[in-house]
């Protein structure tokens, strides 16, 4: 018996008040639907079917890299109707697991428990007990605790509304059972929809065993219906990430002001992360790294004993051990800091390598530049890499000293141990071991007077 997963992602999401389909909104930097697909893949199914509706072509275009089978639900006629669109693609002997594209934090542990505890010919649902179950379907049990049916909130009687045990919608049974039950559903309810939950009563009626597995916590089965629910779930997720990192030896100064946006975030012990730090995409931080407040790191690797000072923005960079960056530095894609390099305040780098022990301490732009070892780049230095049509490279060799307020008009090379005088504008190579100055000689104009203002 193989496993087929059906993810229902056809909800209209009107309460999101957004032109973006609900399932494309991110949680922890990853679209809601992608999170559910990633969890489903951990169960090793042979196929993942996604039933989409609202904004379907846009959803498929944005998430076309996901290894799923896309199925359109052309009319929003309910969850039962949505599963009916996918079930013909499942083999009769398949075990089918039904998930939801807007329930992003369901855990593999809970799903494995559901699959393991549901009889091969039975039906299993994930249930949860909530302090406020308003709006959710209630689990109806008999006097012996057996599940009899699921009643949607809008269709529930007054005594049923007092029940706090709810249906999460997550369900498993065989494809053969679903092919038998789904055509029997009707839409005689307040919403005039075909409810998937009505299959529970059909299962009970024919003596099929029905069981419930409790969710580990309420948040893992929390659906996203509006922006506020998404915001609350985001903070819960970030607290989980902060706790996980803290227990692994990372100091998070304030878990409420920490954001991890991506799945591939690896942080070694003894790293310290200050407030309002955002880690996005693939981020690796080695031992004893210190990240100051208000720092953004995206797709970046940072070596041990390096300090990133406040208000620095770093994307797609490699920073090796014992470096210092910032405050107020910007490292754009392709930037590499070799061991012991230093980038100070208001320095911007793009596709530039700063060699071992080299420094660019302040007020500098380095674009398309290769800098050797032990180079000093003075304040106000600019590598002029763009001629209006093409980008050109600057090379600064080992031991060079670049004075303040220097413009290096690429392409050119500054030789080994060369010194460039402050205020120079170079458009040709500077030879090694020499002082190169390219500026007008200072002069004083005798007898000059400032003009006087007219009355």
UniProtKB/Swiss-Prot annotation:
Its main location: cytoplasm. GO terms for cellular component: cytoplasm; membrane. Mg(2+) binds at residues 102, 225. CDD domains: GT2_GlmU_N_bac, LbH_GlmU_C. Residues 249-455 are annotated as: N-acetyltransferase. It catalyses: alpha-D-glucosamine 1-phosphate + acetyl-CoA = N-acetyl-alpha-D-glucosamine 1-phosphate + CoA + H(+); N-acetyl-alpha-D-glucosamine 1-phosphate + UTP + H(+) = UDP-N-acetyl-alpha-D-glucosamine + diphosphate. It is found in: Cytoplasm. Keywords: Acyltransferase, Cell shape, Cell wall biogenesis/degradation, Cytoplasm, Magnesium, Metal-binding, Multifunctional enzyme, Nucleotidyltransferase, Peptidoglycan synthesis, Repeat, Transferase. Gene3D superfamilies: Hexapeptide repeat proteins, Spore Coat Polysaccharide Biosynthesis Protein SpsA, Chain A. Pfam families: Hexapep, NTP_transf_3. In the N-terminal section; belongs to the N-acetylglucosamine-1-phosphate uridyltransferase family. This is Bifunctional protein GlmU. It comes from Coxiella burnetii (strain RSA 493 / Nine Mile phase I).
């Amino acid at each position: 018996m193989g496993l087929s997963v059906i993810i229902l992602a056809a909800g209209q999401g009107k309460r999101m008040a957004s032109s973006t389909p609900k399932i494309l909104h991110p949680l922890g930097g990853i679209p809601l639907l992608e999170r559910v697909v990633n969890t489903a893949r951990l169960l090793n199914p042979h196929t993942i079917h996604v039933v989409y509706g609202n904004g379907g072509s846009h959803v498929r275009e944005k998430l076309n890299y996901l290894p799923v089978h896309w199925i359109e639900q052309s009319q929003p006629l309910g969850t039962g109707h949505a599963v009916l669109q996918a079930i013909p693609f499942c083999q009769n002997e398949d075990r089918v697991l039904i998930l939801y594209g807007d329930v992003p934090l369901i855990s593999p542990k809970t799903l494995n428990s559901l699959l393991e505890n549901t009889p091969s010919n039975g039906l299993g649902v994930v249930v949860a007990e909530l302090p406020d179950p308003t709006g959710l379907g209630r689990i109806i049990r008999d006097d012996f605790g057996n599940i009899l049916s699921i009643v949607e909130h809008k269709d529930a009687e007054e005594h049923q509304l007092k029940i706090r045990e709810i249906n999460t919608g997550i369900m498993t049974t065989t494809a053969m059972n679903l092919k038998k039950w789904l055509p029997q559903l009707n839409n005689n309810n307040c919403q005039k929809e075909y409810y998937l939950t009505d299959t529970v009563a059909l299962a009970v009626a024919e003596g099929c065993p029905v069981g419930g597995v409790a969710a580990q916590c309420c948040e893992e089965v929390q659906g996203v219906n509006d922006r506020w629910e998404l915001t609350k779930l985001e903070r819960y997720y970030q607290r989980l990430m902060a706790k996980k990192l803290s227990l692994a030896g990372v100091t998070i100064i304030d878990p409420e002001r920490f954001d991890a946006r991506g799945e591939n975030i690896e942080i070694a012990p003894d790293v310290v992360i200050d407030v309002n730090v955002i880690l996005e995409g693939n981020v690796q931080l080695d031992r004893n790294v210190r990240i100051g407040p208000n720092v953004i790191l995206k797709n970046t690797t940072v070596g041990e004993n390096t300090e990133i000072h406040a208000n620095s923005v770093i994307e797609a960079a490699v920073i090796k051990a014992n470096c210092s960056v910032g405050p107020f530095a910007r490292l754009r894609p392709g930037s590499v800091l070799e061991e012991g390099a230093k980038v100070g305040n208001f320095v911007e780098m793009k596709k530039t390598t700063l060699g071992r022990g080299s420094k660019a301490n302040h007020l500098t732009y380095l674009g398309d530049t290769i800098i050797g070892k032990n180079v000093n780049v003075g304040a106000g230095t600019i590598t002029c890499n763009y001629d209006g049509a093409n980008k050109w490279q600057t090379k600064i060799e080992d031991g060079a000293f670049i004075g303040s307020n220097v413009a290096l008009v690429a392409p050119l090379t500054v030789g080994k141990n060369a010194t460039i005088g402050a205020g120079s504008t170079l458009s040709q190579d500077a030879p090694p071991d020499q002082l190169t100055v390219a500026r007008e000689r200072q002069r004083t104009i005798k007898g000059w007077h400032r003009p006087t203002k007219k009355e």
